Amino acid sequence: MRKAGANRNNERQGRNLGQQGPQMSPPGPSMMYPHHHQHQHHHQHQHQHQHQHQHPHQHPHQHHHHHPHHNGVYGNAYDNIRQPQMPPHSFGQGVSGSPWNSPPQQTPMYNQGYNQMSPGTGGGYGDMGGMYRDVHGGQYPSSPSHMGGGANIPYGRNPAMHNGLPAGAPLPGGYGALPHQGAHTPMGFGRGGQPLMEHMQPSGMYGAPMMRHDGYPDTRVSPPAQVGYGAGAPVGPPPPPPMPAGPPYGGVLPGAGVGPGGPMNASRPPAGIGGGGGGGGNAGYLEMRARGMGPQMPASNASRPPRIGTPDPGMMPPNRMNQSPMMGQGLPPQVGNFMPLPGVSPSPHAMIPTTPSMGDTFPGDDANMSGSTEALYDFLHDRGLVSVDNISKFFPEGYGKDDPALKVAVDGNFCLTSLRDELRKRDSLWFLHSTLPEELLMLVQQHVEWMRNMKLEPIWVFNGLSVSGDVETFLTTEAELRARDAVWSKLEDGEIPDEVEIQEAFDQPLGEDVQMAVARYLKEELGVMAVTAPFLNWAQMVAFHKEGIADLLMGPPEMLLLPYDEMKVIVQIDVSNSSVNYLDRDRVLRALFPNHVTETNTRVAGDRLMDLGLITATHAALSSARVTLNLSMQEVYEELSTPTPKFRSIKDFINAHACSQETGKKAGLSIKHSKGRGYLRYSAVFSTKSRDTPLVYLVRVLDPDLTNADMPTNLAGVLGHLVPLSLFYMQFSGLLSVRIMTAITQSYLRDECPVSDTKDYHTTLGLLMTMRSQVIGQILKRIAHPPPIKRTECLSWVRWFQPILAPMDRPRDLIDLDEWEISDSDQLKKLDEDCLADYSIASVLSVTADASRPAVEESNRPAGRVPIRYNSKRETFLAILLKSFDFLGYFSHSTAPNDAVDGMEMECCGMDGHDRGGSVPAAYHEKDLSSMKRSEASDINFMADEGLKDYPSVYFPIYLRATIKANPLDVQASFVLLTELVRVRIINSNPCRYINPANQQVEISMDDQDTNSDSRVLLASRIACLVKLPYRRASENLPFVWAPVYSRHLCAFTVMVRAMCRCLRELVEVITSTVFLSGNSSCSLQDFAEFASILPFGDVPSTIGGLLLHYVLVFPSDYQANLTSREERIEYLQGKFRDIPDLADHLHLVMSFTLQALYLINAYMLNDKETIVAKDQLTGTIVEDTIEMMWQKWRDHIDDNPPGDIHNLYPPRHQEPIPH
């Protein structure tokens, strides 16, 4: 019997997420580490981390339900709210007192997950002397390559199953037809006329049957059905007219599996179109390119022609194409000159960023001056292997203007960063405003429009999971940090640095959150198919082309390394004259390796090209597999191409020319190379042709005769843990981030160096790591067998500051979320099935916690029988939101009478009876211990130990709900974000503590920092950054105008806000995934994929609102220009912030939101006693003083009255109307 205000049971306070895990080693399987410095080679860094799990005590798994105020998902910041005193083993390495913190053992990183290598036995290159042969008859040369062993997960083999094989229902639809991913007009079916996923059986990753987490066959998973273009499109367009007679498009050979002559047995999804590769062409290249130049900034856009494609990646420094392991891992590689400004005069000169000079030094590799730095594009261009032709050559004979556009698979990472470089030419300080400015989205739109004008329909394919690699590539060098500090110093002094300084200091990756936001924009706004590959996006693009989903391929030259004979890669399209620069793989192989080809076979040459590309890799997708040798690219090529090689194996060749002759480092180089070979050959891709699963190895797509028995058994060391196939579909559709997939398959999380690094950010990340470990634990709990606690012990945290590799301590117990009985709730009735995006968070928070029910244990359920609890999309979506907010502690789970709770809400929030949408229970005078410490090892701040505290008489979500209801829907998530930022102390009025570039563990002395930081201005302007404002030029021809304020502290603040946004977004993604995996929803995988665009917290923060308010607050009322009226002041501000349209309206929005947020914080401070606001977080009368200042500035600029405090907690004297 539950009594009012009490917990359901004594275990509901199990939100203790303090760091209590063991010392953790670097993850064994699969990590890729990108560059973060413009002139940086990959250097093997053997971190001597190996953990030996010692568990003196076996802790039984407990289901900890929520305490009435289970606010502890962030660990230390939240644990101090309603948690018992923690033992002294919270965060950090080597902290005494923890049974989980056993001393780490040490072993070379690259030996993690691998058996001892046996001596090489075969001759020739491609032979790593390994444990298995990674080549197959008829497909690859006889060159076995070692990729390591020791993994116990039999990829490609069928594990033991209960009750035999799955039910075997065909999987409908095609992977190219996810919701909103079609083109704007139907493009017809693919080659063959059959449904794309015909004859597919639900099964596991890489050919293994798909299993539920309890070991039974998972018969619920199916790929999305064909839905056409957009949300409400029909199930598929009628077949197009028969394709013209003759050879397939672009000269693809009949019988090659592409085109009418090939044995294709599947149709193109609505987003597909038949076609083949490109045609032949001139071997010359139209432009001269200078190499060996310094990192000069490109010339102005006025002299550049429009270009589409991935031009000359070789002209970039290795780290400029800075993908991360999350999306290619998640962070797009860079390349210049992808898009021009429209309406500019053409010029024959393409401005491509240049390679670093040989005088540049590379961290960790002082003796590497003779290492190869030439990029693959340069290498091929110098040999006349870049073909040039007109785009018309890529269209089929007889193609008319009314025929459907050709589908082009585009490397999304490469493309997006190329557009970022165009933005850099317009505004070299673009990143100070936002990592996703509107101008970048405008460039994306222009890119799509230009391609469509040329009758090309793009398919953006983003990178997925990566391969393990060199952790030292994460390090940001001291020189780069010093350059950043110098640029910031100039900006703070009012001086604009030159473009070369800015580019050298801030060669930043975009981030997976930006990439996924762009993918959602492509799908929702532009109708472009945008997907995330399971692993290497080039492999998925090849699969698309092989199976007729795409007609053409557009990507970097490194795509030639894939063993696909029918490959012609477009690297650039000049819009001004329709010329196309492309690479023909067959021609390249025959020209480079004439001694290793026959008239009909280039397999051996392809193997040599793969070795050459991996040894000299400059592309970020391969950088973690690059081995640095004391040879130039030409010298490497000469050894690989000669008919009489000096070395019997590639392993011997690498060992002989390694920069370091230490045995351990040379072994690491060999493993890196072999991992790269395996990653290129065995990346998993979605396929329409597999007999048993749509997710197969690339080699099986290229050679359908290969079976599971032909596949290696130790690929876990390259690709990671086995997970349900449905998770890869979720990643494919953009619902589940690659960051989360990396954590659950490859056991690590990564954080990149921010634009403005602060000690506060380091502290914040440490706090958020506890939440992230709990979030990951939620999905591991659903899929892991053995239990998830074993898998979470292996999680590692990779970051840019020392120590670069840290343990990601697991929570003692995982949060056990309740289910919800909502089928008859009023809140559900308010949701429109067709307009779920219009949901109200206030309505979600008004659901009484009495509707929650303890989850039924999986072990108690009969096999294959999962009760359906949520019977529609709106029920499922509401349950996802309820579970997410429950995870954050927004439901008290008390049994207080509804009338008592409602009366309390009306009294505290000043709400009439008709205004309330439901009841939010509150706890009554419970006891809790609030604690906080500081762990020196992991540098995590804990709040001061304050002892026992009384629970507040009013529960904080009541104030949040009331505030949301009083504001527009488009800012509702911002108030939730505000609450979470306050809870972890990111919102405060203290100046940021900037990191000392000479020592990333030390902050710059406050005496050396600018002290123009009025605490009221800091607090108000930071809050204003949570408002999203438009900021873009009204016309392309307008000159760029710098905004009047550059705030280093606002930039540093938004870095922390962005980290919080990512955590919250990952939370709702994981909760969505767990609802699907639990099997208690009637929704299909397609239905879940549609949630990706409407789940909250997907926005990327911007400083524009904060910059605008900061400018208003720090200047006198006349702006030193004798302005006497509000109209004059607004007009003056509009001139300063020209790119903010309708400035008066947006200033009203910013100031109104900031005041409402201050009222909310004031309510938290007064009536929820340190549940949200720490005692020393906002001291004195800072909140009241800031409100006073805001009111005064409101009088100076806005005509109507400011918003009042809807909570009726601010002094009544401030509620009087303001005279005009």
From Swiss-Prot:
<dbReference type="GO" id="GO:0008409">
    <property type="term" value="F:5'-3' exonuclease activity"/>
</dbReference>
<dbReference type="InterPro" id="IPR029060">
    <property type="entry name" value="PIN-like_dom_sf"/>
</dbReference>
<dbReference type="GO" id="GO:0035061">
    <property type="term" value="C:interchromatin granule"/>
</dbReference>
<dbReference type="InterPro" id="IPR006084">
    <property type="entry name" value="XPG/Rad2"/>
</dbReference>
<comment type="function">
    <text>Involved in post-transcriptional regulation of gene expression.</text>
</comment>
<feature type="region of interest" description="Disordered">
    <location>
        <begin position="1"/>
        <end position="107"/>
    </location>
</feature>
<dbReference type="GO" id="GO:0005737">
    <property type="term" value="C:cytoplasm"/>
</dbReference>
<dbReference type="GO" id="GO:0017108">
    <property type="term" value="F:5'-flap endonuclease activity"/>
</dbReference>
<dbReference type="GO" id="GO:0006417">
    <property type="term" value="P:regulation of translation"/>
</dbReference>
<dbReference type="InterPro" id="IPR022039">
    <property type="entry name" value="MKT1_C"/>
</dbReference>
<keyword id="KW-0963">Cytoplasm</keyword>
<keyword id="KW-0810">Translation regulation</keyword>
<comment type="subunit">
    <text>Forms a complex composed of at least MKT1L, PBP1, XAC1 and LSM12.</text>
</comment>
<protein>
    <recommendedName>
        <fullName>Post-transcriptional regulator MKT1L</fullName>
    </recommendedName>
</protein>
<dbReference type="Pfam" id="PF12247">
    <property type="entry name" value="MKT1_N"/>
</dbReference>
<feature type="compositionally biased region" description="Basic residues">
    <location>
        <begin position="34"/>
        <end position="70"/>
    </location>
</feature>
<dbReference type="InterPro" id="IPR022040">
    <property type="entry name" value="MKT1_N"/>
</dbReference>
<comment type="similarity">
    <text>Belongs to the XPG/RAD2 endonuclease family.</text>
</comment>
<dbReference type="Pfam" id="PF12246">
    <property type="entry name" value="MKT1_C"/>
</dbReference>
